[in-house]
From Swiss-Prot:
Superkingdom in the source lineage: Bacteria
Quaternary structure and partners: Heteromultimer composed of HisG and HisZ subunits.
GO annotation, biological process: L-histidine biosynthetic process
Organism: Pseudomonas aeruginosa (strain ATCC 15692 / DSM 22644 / CIP 104116 / JCM 14847 / LMG 12228 / 1C / PRS 101 / PAO1)
CDD domains: HisRS-like_core
Listed GO CC annotations: cytoplasm
HAMAP family noted in UniProt: HisZ
Other remarks in the entry: This function is generally fulfilled by the C-terminal part of HisG, which is missing in some bacteria such as this one.
Protein function: Required for the first step of histidine biosynthesis. May allow the feedback regulation of ATP phosphoribosyltransferase activity by histidine.
Assigned keywords, A-Z: Amino-acid biosynthesis, Cytoplasm, Histidine biosynthesis
Subcellular location field: Cytoplasm
Gene for this chain: hisZ
Protein name: ATP phosphoribosyltransferase regulatory subunit
Length: 394
């Protein structure tokens, strides 16, 4: 390997230098403190574990994004976590085994074998919150509200929300009795709003059901899209009506809590269709193709760990949150430069550090010129037999 190649990092893998690392850490602490104030308990999941446990209930997409290695100790296949959410769901279902609602949060690096999109990081810092044990829309409203408060605290500008409900399509597909292959083709067509393809794929269905499936490709926009949905899906099965009413209830609650927030609804939005079971949501900012935060309801995942529990939550990439946010997270780099040695110097330095001061002590051979590079704007000087803090000599 040439010397120059030793400095190269793989595509999508980044190192974070000061002061950016300090900004990310400050944001992490602020967000976790926010979660704590809402009653969410912090958990830490393994970076690597056996593949069958890591991917249980997660679907093919996560499998493709997971780096895999063989464990030398057992010979079993292991994976580096690409998504922390399934790990936290396992904690709730298998390790904690609480009967009532459980609020958990997390923050940690994940690793993606494939990026989510072009030019995105393969080593994001995933941060999120999950609420288990309550099936009501009130839980969805809580986690969406927490997500929006997080974005507000980070001062992410011009946020708008996209909301949908996969239960609407699930109910119609179930009523149509679609085969797995046709259901997948119809899913793809709806994501592209390809009305002609939707018409072709549903040509053999009863006219009423065919019309409702086509409507999913057209029911998108502001609050009026929900009212149009009520009218155009009036003959839909009961489970579709329940899903639509849940979405309307959530939308009304959010409009009351965040009256200035732009809300966009898409009844054909099937993000995470093979994973989510209810409402799905994402926050976007203008000029950025990918969502800044996203989540939804995923009630079935706990069953794979022996205990099905209602669940809803969201996640974000902390690096992106800091990049897009305008909050003043810069920590002023200042400190006190102390000489390498001196009578009573150690005691003076320790007193200052206990008081919360940043003190950098010179190493042998270093002079005051090194103080600026170390981020110091003051110095510890011996005057009249006492160590005193003074301005750094220019």
């Amino acid at each position: 390997m040439a010397t120059v190649d030793r400095w190269l990092l793989p595509d999508g893998i980044e190192e974070v230098l000061p002061p950016e690392a300090a900004r990310i850490e400050a944001a992490r602490r602020q967000v976790l403190d926010l979660f704590h104030r809402w009653g969410y308990e912090f958990v830490v999941t393994p970076h690597i574990e056996y593949l069958e446990s890591l991917l249980t209930g997660a679907g093919q997409d996560l499998d493709l994004r997971t780096f895999k290695v063989t464990d030398p100790a057992s010979g079993r296949l292991m994976g580096f976590r690409a998504d922390i959410t399934p790990q936290v769901a396992r904690m709730d279902a298998h390790s904690l085994r609480r009967e009532g609602p459980s609020r958990l949060c997390y923050a940690g690096s994940v690793l993606h074998a494939q990026p989510r999109a072009l030019s995105t990081s393969r080593s994001p810092i995933q941060l999120g919150a999950e609420l288990y044990g309550d099936p009501s829309p009130a839980s969805d409203v809580e986690v969406i509200s927490l997500m929006l408060e997080m974005l507000e605290m980070a001062e992410v500008p011009d946020v708008h929300m996209d909301l949908g409900h996969v239960g609407i399509y699930r109910g119609l597909a179930r009523a149509a009795g679609l085969s797995g292959e046709v259901e997948q083709q119809l899913f793809d067509a709806l994501q592209r709003k390809a009305v002609d393809e939707v018409e072709a794929l549903t040509a053999d269905l009863p006219a009423e059901l065919r019309g409702m499936l086509r409507a999913l490709a057209e029911l998108c926009g502001g609050r009026d899209a929900l009212e149009q949905g009520r009218a155009r899906l009036a003959a839909a099965p009961a489970d579709v009506q329940v899903a639509l009413n849940e979405l309307i209830e959530i939308a009304d609650s959010l409009a009351g809590r965040f009256p200035g927030l732009p809300l966009y609804f898409d009844l054909g939005e099937l993000r995470g269709y093979h994973y989510h079971t209810g409402v799905v949501f994402a926050a976007f900012v203008p000029g950025v193709g990918q969502s800044i935060a996203q989540g939804g309801r995923y009630d079935d995942i706990g069953a794979d760990f022996g205990r099905a529990r209602p669940a809803t939550g969201f996640s974000t990439d902390l690096k992106s949150l800091v990049t897009l946010g305008q909050a003043r997270l810069d920590q002023a780099v200042s400190g006190i430069w102390a000489p390498a040695e001196g009578a009573g110097l150690w005691q003076a330095v320790q007193r200052l550090r206990r008081d919360g001061q940043r003190v950098v002590q010179a190493l042998p051979g270093q002079d005051a010129a090194s103080a600026r590079e170390a981020g110091c704007d003051r110095q510890l000087a011996l005057r009249d037999g006492n160590w005193q803090v003074a301005p750094l000599a220019s």
